[in-house]
Amino acid sequence: MKTLKKLLFIIMAVAVLAMPVFGVQAAESDIPVTEQSGVSPTPSPVPIRELVTRGNKIYYYYKGKMVKNKWKRYNGYKYYFGANGNAVRGGQRINNVIYVFDEKGRLFENKQNKIVKSGSNIYHIRTEHGRASIGYFIYKNNLYYADPKGRLYQKKSRQNGQLYFTNSGAARKDYNALLKMRVMQIVSSITNSGMSQSQKLYACWKYVVYGGFYYGGPDPNIYKSGWARSEALRMFRTGYGNC
């Protein structure tokens, strides 16, 4: 029983250490965005505001000058123009936050908790302001993983092949994925964003030691690959397990 409890704590500790850390960001209202009209107030040889497409690149000009490293809203859509003046696409890190833009450079707004596609990649939007999920997350009772640029894993494995992510981005629902989701749910329920990493680990340790887990159930086949993780899943689900 002690061996299984150690395994449960190790699994929860790994989940805590793997949790993405989101630094304190400026409020969405703090992002400098200038509302711009798509129509020049008066005819002019040089338009005051102009969105220009050259090949597959999109630029924004204000009084004839190319805008760089700025957010701009044009005809109701929000764009970010990078260091080269080109509107960014896909998942982009801006002020240490990953935002997602479509193939026309428009920010995915009002798409909170939805999966979207941009180019050949898919992303999960976690806020109404276009911020992407990073790392492991649960969506519609399925496990997903997003890389540091917010791109969902598709037809790829993680954790030495224990987790396989299908073409939809959802992990194959075997005991490995189910265990990962159960641990994430438990850790989320016993910790909070204000806790330090050591406080979270201590909370997990207390949960395993004092959480009311008992020895019981049929003997597992210890010669079968993955038996320990399968028993850990049963323990987390029912409170009983056989070490």
Where are the predicted features?
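General helical secondary-structure elements
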Residues: 1-2, 196
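Extracellular adhesion/carbohydrate-binding repeat motifs centered on closely spaced tryptophans
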Residues: 2-181
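Secondary-structure boundary elements
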Residues: 178-235
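Acidic, glycine-rich loop-and-strand cores that form catalytic or ligand-binding grooves
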Residues: 238
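Mid-length scaffold segments of soluble, non-membrane domains
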Residues: 242-243
